[in-house]
């Protein structure tokens, strides 16, 4: 039985959910890869589809030896980076993995830092407009950048268009603005035989794969999600 305060809180939450405020914003938590992640209005709520990107990264890291350096571009809540770091501790063959998460949003980086502390995972977080303030080269770069076409944002579910941060959704007129930059600039930040892995929209694999090919990436592959839609494009840079 609820006391008066609990009852008031309960009906307040019901009212807010009726206003299409995401459940994750009401609870402040979303599970991803089996881990709890803090979320708020400053970060994209982690989606199950994005777990495909983490699984693809882990499938490569299982075969790596020595020290691995990992960059998560557009890190948001840090769910991709921190899940990979956490799971490599028990699943992968590398001796040690250093993780860096980059995002333009200071508020998002605050959330990512809190999530790292909760999970007991060490990572460096950097405020950067893509690679602008990123130094050094990495064994792997992963990213789930904004990829919704500007003109389509108004058609999204209210929970998404009104409550996920616009800067985490808007990929420009064709949804591909961030891929152009990430692919072009990543070649200056990958070690030889380094991997680039990108989450994509269902109809973006051809364009993204072709740009990676033109930039010098090889062994380009496309991974589908559970719905059978193209979800992750990856490639190896031999530069």
Where are the predicted features?
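Conserved SAM/SAH cofactor-binding pocket of Class I
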Residues: 52-155
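C-terminal beta-strand of the catalytic ATP-binding
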Residues: 145-147, 236-239
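Conserved beta-strand segments of alpha/beta enzyme cores
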Residues: 36, 98, 122-124, 218-221
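Class I S-adenosylmethionine-dependent transferase superfamily signal
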Residues: 57, 84, 160, 182-186
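Conserved AdoMet
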Residues: 1-60
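Mobile active-site "lid"/loop adjacent to the S-adenosyl-L-methionine
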Residues: 147-177
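Short loop/edge segments at beta-strand edges and connector loops
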Residues: 27, 126-128, 200, 224
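Conserved Class I SAM-dependent methyltransferase catalytic core
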Residues: 173-237
């Amino acid at each position: 039985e609820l006391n008066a305060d609990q009852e008031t809180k309960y009906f307040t939450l019901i009212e807010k959910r009726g206003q299409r405020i995401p459940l994750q914003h009401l609870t402040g938590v979303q599970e991803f890869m089996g881990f709890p992640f803090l979320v708020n209005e400053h970060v994209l709520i982690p989606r199950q589809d994005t777990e495909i990107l983490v699984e693809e990264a882990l499938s490569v890291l299982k075969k790596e030896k020595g020290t691995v350096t990992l960059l998560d571009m557009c890190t948001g809540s840090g769910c991709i980076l921190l899940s990979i770091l956490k799971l490599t501790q028990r699943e992968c063959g590398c001796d040690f993995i250093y993780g860096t998460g980059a995002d333009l949003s200071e508020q998002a980086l605050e959330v990512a830092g809190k999530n790292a502390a909760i999970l007991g995972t060490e990572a460096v977080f950097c405020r950067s407009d893509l690679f602008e303030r990123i130094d050094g080269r990495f064994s792997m770069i992963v990213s789930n950048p904004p990829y919704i076409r500007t003109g389509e944002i108004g058609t999204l579910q209210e929970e998404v268009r009104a409550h996920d941060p616009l800067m985490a959704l808007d990929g420009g007129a064709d949804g591909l603005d961030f891929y152009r930059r990430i692919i072009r600039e990543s070649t200056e930040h990958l070690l030889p035989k380094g991997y680039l892995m990108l989450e994509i929209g269902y109809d973006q694999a051809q364009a993204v794969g072709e740009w990676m090919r033109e930039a010098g990436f090889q062994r380009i592959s496309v991974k589908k999600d559970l719905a059978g839609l193209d979800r992750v494009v990856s490639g190896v840079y031999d530069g």
